[in-house]
């Protein structure tokens, strides 16, 4: 696949593009939506300078910071998520690299969440090959490490971690036989070509991502992008085109509509489902930011006749 071929797919008439994406989606997945819950298990004081992130220690934001939560409180959240219908419990920690003093505790938490009957996913920053192997042994199913944007635009967003470092972490995850969860963020001021190049980078990862989060910027006061923009710099039709193109390029990946969904109309979310989305974060909170409410999600899924994969088990 070349950059030009990706452009040609994206540029098709919208109805034709959505139809092809929907046909591919139905062939591989059918009518189910994966419900995932996301918990911030360590919040704030991150040494990274990601310009979109309120958890960066470089910026003055209003988030409530805390160290790694205790195991019992995390397990209680996981049980609640399962009872609410989630299939996967994702845990995020604001680290550039997991501290040695916390590694064993995180591994133990993964094992106990797995024992609840949930799929496990973590995002802990960079990990080396040995750490990836130990997380696999603990029962980890997915490791999230987003590319965020194209290689070319990346230095405009982050300077404390090189793009190639992200690729190396994904290589370590894949070599440990952990499923790769990797996507990006739209609406940070990037060009269309940057979005196409992000897709090309995802195609060229050491292992094909089994899960692709598609985020739109949530401008948060105190962050450089939050102070620059009041809304994500992408319209609904561009988002739907991007999702449909992603579905065509990744027919067997779960595409997750992630950050920014709270600000989308039900009609826009419906188009996203038609274009290939088959996973959402379910719950009123998304790390430090509000998410679409459980009630609104239940209403929309019922309105569209979509079933969660928990209901189909």
UniProtKB/Swiss-Prot annotation:
- Residue pairs linked by disulfide bridges in the UniProt entry: none
Q: Keyword check for RNA-binding, yes or no.
A: no
Binding site residues for [2Fe-2S] cluster:
90, 121, 181, 256
Q: Which SUPFAM superfamilies match?
A: Radical SAM enzymes
Q: Which UniProt keywords apply?
A: 2Fe-2S, 4Fe-4S, Biotin biosynthesis, Iron, Iron-sulfur, Metal-binding, S-adenosyl-L-methionine, Transferase
Cofactor: bound how, per the entry note? Binds 1 [4Fe-4S] cluster. The cluster is coordinated with 3 cysteines and an exchangeable S-adenosyl-L-methionine. Binds 1 [2Fe-2S] cluster. The cluster is coordinated with 3 cysteines and 1 arginine.
Kindly list the cofactors needed: [4Fe-4S] cluster; [2Fe-2S] cluster
Mention any Pfam family matching this sequence.
Radical_SAM
**Entry's InterPro entries?**
Aldolase_TIM (IPR013785), BATS_dom (IPR010722), Biotin_synth/BioAB (IPR002684), Biotin_synthase (IPR024177), Elp3/MiaA/NifB-like_rSAM (IPR006638), rSAM (IPR007197)
Q: Which residues form the Radical SAM core domain?
A: 28-258
Its biological function? Catalyzes the conversion of dethiobiotin (DTB) to biotin by the insertion of a sulfur atom into dethiobiotin via a radical-based mechanism.
Q: What is this protein called?
A: Biotin synthase
Species this protein is from = Francisella tularensis subsp. tularensis (strain SCHU S4 / Schu 4)
């Amino acid at each position: 696949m070349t950059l030009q071929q990706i452009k040609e797919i994206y540029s098709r008439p919208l109805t034709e593009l959505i139809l092809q994406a929907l046909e591919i989606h139905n062939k591989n997945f059918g009518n189910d939506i994966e419900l995932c819950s996301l918990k911030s298990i360590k919040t704030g004081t991150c040494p990274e300078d990601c310009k979109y992130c309120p958890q960066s220690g470089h910026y003055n934001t209003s988030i409530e910071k805390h160290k790694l939560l205790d195991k019992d409180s995390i397990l209680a959240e996981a049980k609640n998520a399962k009872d609410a219908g989630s299939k996967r419990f994702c845990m995020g920690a604001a680290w550039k690299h997991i501290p040695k003093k916390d590694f064993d505790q995180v591994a133990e938490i993964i094992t106990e969440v797995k024992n609840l009957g949930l799929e496990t996913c973590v995002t802990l920053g960079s990990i080396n090959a040995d750490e990836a192997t130990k997380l696999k042994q603990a029962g980890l199913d997915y490791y999230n490490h987003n590319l965020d944007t194209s290689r070319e635009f990346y230095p405009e967003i982050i300077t404390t971690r090189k793009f190639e470092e992200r690729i190396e972490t994904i290589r370590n995850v894949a070599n440990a036989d952990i499923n790769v969860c990797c996507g990006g963020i739209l609406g940070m001021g990037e060009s269309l070509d940057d979005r196409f190049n992000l897709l090309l980078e995802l195609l060229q990862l050491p292992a094909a991502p089994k899960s692709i989060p598609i985020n739109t910027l949530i401008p948060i006061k105190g962050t450089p992008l939050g102070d620059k923009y009041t809304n994500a710099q992408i319209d609904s039709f561009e988002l739907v085109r991007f999702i449909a193109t992603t579905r065509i390029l990744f027919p067997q990946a779960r595409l997750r509509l992630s950050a920014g969904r709270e600000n989308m109309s039900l009609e826009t979310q419906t188009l996203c489902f038609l274009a290939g989305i088959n996973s959402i974060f379910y719950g009123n909170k998304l790390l430090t930011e509000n998410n679409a409410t459980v009630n609104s999600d239940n209403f929309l899924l019922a309105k569209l006749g979509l079933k969660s994969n928990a209901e189909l088990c």
